[in-house]
Swiss-Prot record:
Source organism per UniProt: Candida glabrata (strain ATCC 2001 / BCRC 20586 / JCM 3761 / NBRC 0622 / NRRL Y-65 / CBS 138)
Main location: cytoplasm
InterPro entries in the cross-refs: Cut8/Sts1_fam, Cut8/Sts1_sf
Descriptive protein name: Tethering factor for nuclear proteasome STS1
Lineage: Eukaryota, Fungi, Dikarya, Ascomycota, Saccharomycotina
Biological process terms in GO annotation: chromosome segregation; nuclear protein quality control by the ubiquitin-proteasome system; proteasome localization; protein transport
Region (Disordered): 1-27
Family: Belongs to the cut8/STS1 family.
GO cellular component, as recorded: cytoplasm; nuclear membrane
Described function: Involved in ubiquitin-mediated protein degradation. Regulatory factor in the ubiquitin/proteasome pathway that controls the turnover of proteasome substrates. Targets proteasomes to the nucleus and facilitates the degradation of nuclear proteins.
Gene3D superfamilies (UniProt xref): Tethering factor for nuclear proteasome Cut8/Sts1
Key word Iron-sulfur present: no
Keywords linked to the UniProt accession: Cytoplasm, Nucleus, Protein transport, Transport
Amino acid sequence: MSGQMFWGKKEDGKRKRSFQESYETPKVQKCVRKRRPALNVQGQPLPPQRSLEMMSKDQLMSVLMEVMRQHPEVGSTFQAKVSSYQFASEKYQQLLKGKVEQLYSNIPYNRSYDNTNLDDYAFVRMKPYITELLNCLVDCALDNLPPRKSDLHESLKFLESCTQLVLDLPRFESGSNNYYYDKCLEQISHLWCSLIEQISKDIHMVMNTNMEEWITKLNAYNERSNGLLTSAVTLFKSLASDGDLLGDQQNEMESPAYVAGPGLLLESNPSYLMHNKYSM
C-alpha cells in the first residue's frame, strides 16, 4: 500500500513538471537595432541654369549689369555676341512703348498727359523716365541705321517714328525743363542727315524714293520742333535736286544719241555722322 502511494506521488510530480514545462512562457529575444549613419542633407542654391529659368526679366538684367560692371571683359564678350543679332522693327517699337507708358504713368495726377504746360514738380518726378526713354530711343535709332540695317526704306520709317514720338511727348512750362527734348531732337537731326548721306550713295534708292513726300513730312516735323530739324530738311531738298538731275541724265543715257562718259558720280554732301552716343 505504501509502495503504491509512493509511486503515485512520484508520478503526480512528473505530471506537474511536464504540465508546467508545456505551458512555460517562451523566452522573447531582444531585437537590437543596428545604428545607421546620420543623414545630414542641407538645402543648397539652384544651379545657374535653373536660376536663369526662375528669374524674372528685371532680376536677370540687374544681375547681368552688375556682373558686367564688376568684370568689364564680360561686357565686351556679351556685346560681341549680341551685336550679331538682328531684331524686328516691332521689337524696338514695343520697347519704346513700354518706356513711354512708364513716363506717362509718372505724370502728377493734377496734370493731364496731353498738357503742354507741366510744372517744375512734374519735371522733377518725370526726369529719370524722360532720360531713360530718350537714351533708349537714340540707341534703337542708331541700331536701325546703315550698316546695321541694309534696307534704307525701313531706316527712314523707323527714324520717322522716333521723330514723331519725341514731338508727341508732353512739354513743360519752363523752357529749361524741355532741354532734354530739344537736345534729343538735335541728335535726331544728325541721324536724319547721316541717313540722307547714305541714301545719296545709292542711285537706285534716290530714283525710287518719293523725295517730295519725305520733304513735306520733315518740314512739318521741323515746324513742330521750332527749326531743330532744319539741316535735315535742307539736305533732303539738296538730295531731291540731285535726284532730278540724275533722272534727266538717266534719260539721256537711255536715248540713242547718248555717248557714255567717264561715269556719273553723285556729289556727296557734308557728313553729319554721329560718332558718339547721345548722353543726358
